[in-house]
Amino acid sequence: MASRNMNNVFVYCEIEGTQVQEVSQELLTKGRKLANELGVDLNAIVAGTGIKGKVEEQILPYGVDKLFVFDGEGLFPYTSAPHTDILVNLFKEEKPQICLMGATVIGRDLGPRVSSSLTSGLTADCTELEIGPYEDKKNQKTYDNLLYQIRQIGRASCRERVF
């Protein structure tokens, strides 16, 4: 398990009532793979009303090292402001390297808000995300970085934090 503030991989889990959505389960699987490749922890976030004790068994089996559960009035159904505040405050403290969100109505609303608030990178509509080599010829160094496949655009790479 990685130590605190090691730029872990995070997955934002979408829920409907107390049911974790399939897109989040898929992202947890990919998140575990990326975390293993990077040698960091996989953390998951879920926010809703009346969810504590009802969502953990749906999320933890995916190899999540730490689960952040935010349970309170006004967190379900989803609205932008409280969920953005939760993620921005958490990410300021935890400093994730990557946060995966679904390409859903919620993910497309929340991702840009969090990214803008933190002035971080945002890569939308990825169909593939992997760790690969990046050669900085100017500084004669090679880094492991993110390679991602975007619908209809092709392949690109990024060395900065991506949400």
Regions found by a protein language model. Give the residues of each.
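N-terminal glycine-rich FAD/FM-binding segment characteristic of electron-transfer flavoproteins
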Residues: 1-161
